[in-house]
A protein has these predicted regions:
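Non-ligating segments of multi-cofactor redox enzymes
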Residues: 1-223, 233, 241-259
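Short linker/helix segments within small regulatory modules
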Residues: 227-237
């Protein structure tokens, strides 16, 4: 289904514009979950239509210096991925949450009405992902090999049935019970974006209106809702704000801003 005539840069332009739009809507209090669902569907569709902005894969092709696989000149790829990283540092992980097709199909799957497994092992998951990141770099620089090919990302969105496609379908099935397994355990680009979000300028924060009911902590699938959490693994999914019983107790704002 992927239309090769449409430049992959179009997907990144969509993402860069929408990061700013989503951040504004969150900041102004105008964000609605219905809009979130619309973006999830659009972004997933773009994955199948133009295979962009599939940042994990394009980041890998950039490291491999594979211009053909990247779908754009190397300098364009560098600029695009760097700008996404900068915007994540400013606004948080809206790209991962609503715009990357790999993330959006997992997010959609996570809403399946089945029992959830919510392991409070955030640091361990980040260590596992860092280990995969090292493997990713070793395979790229020493073997010029595609680490992500084993997870079938490209084959899945190109609608090609391979062993890798089956693996990625398995990831989606797992996503129904365990939130975003690829993003949290495997994605090499997420290593960089999580660092950006951890030091980010804007985050979801509790205000003085919080009554410490801990409903947000119980609802958060990545264990990032406690006071003092760095929000490195916060995908702005909205589960915490949806369940919060006090208006204004959770706000998306500049760090050190409105309370």
């Amino acid at each position: 289904m992927v239309v090769s005539q449409i430049p992959k840069a179009a997907g990144f332009m969509y993402a860069l514009v929408m990061i700013g739009v989503i951040a504004y809507l969150w900041y102004s209090g105008r964000w609605r979950q219905k809009l979130g669902w619309l973006l999830l569907v659009i972004s997933a569709f773009l994955g199948f239509l133009i295979f962009s902005p599939v940042a994990p894969w394009q980041f890998q092709q950039l490291v491999l210096r594979d211009v053909q696989g990247l779908g754009a000149p190397l300098i364009v790829g560098v600029i695009g991925l760097f700008v996404v990283l900068v915007l994540t540092f400013i606004f948080g992980r809206f790209f991962c949450g609503y715009l990357c097709p790999v993330g959006t199909v997992q997010e959609i799957a996570s809403h399946a009405p089945v029992p959830k497994v919510n392991l409070r092992q955030k640091k361990m998951f980040m260590v596992i992902r860092a280990g995969f990141f090292i493997v990713f770099l070793l395979m790229a620089f020493l073997l010029s090999a595609s680490f992500l090919a084993y997870f079938g990302i490209r084959d899945f969105f190109y609608l090609v049935l391979t062993a890798g496609t089956v693996v990625f379908i398995g990831v989606l099935v797992l996503s129904m019970t365990f939130y975003r397994p690829f993003c949290r355990l495997v994605c090499p680009y997420a290593v960089l974006l999580s660092l950006g979000a951890w030091k980010g300028l804007f985050k979801l924060q509790r205000t003085d209106a919080c009554i410490e009911c801990k409903k947000c902590e119980n609802a958060c699938p990545t264990d990032e809702a406690k006071r003092g959490d760095g929000k490195a693994e916060c995908y702005l999914c909205g589960r915490c704000t949806d369940i919060c019983p006090v208006a204004g107790a959770l706000k998306y704002d500049r760090v050190g801003g409105r309370t």
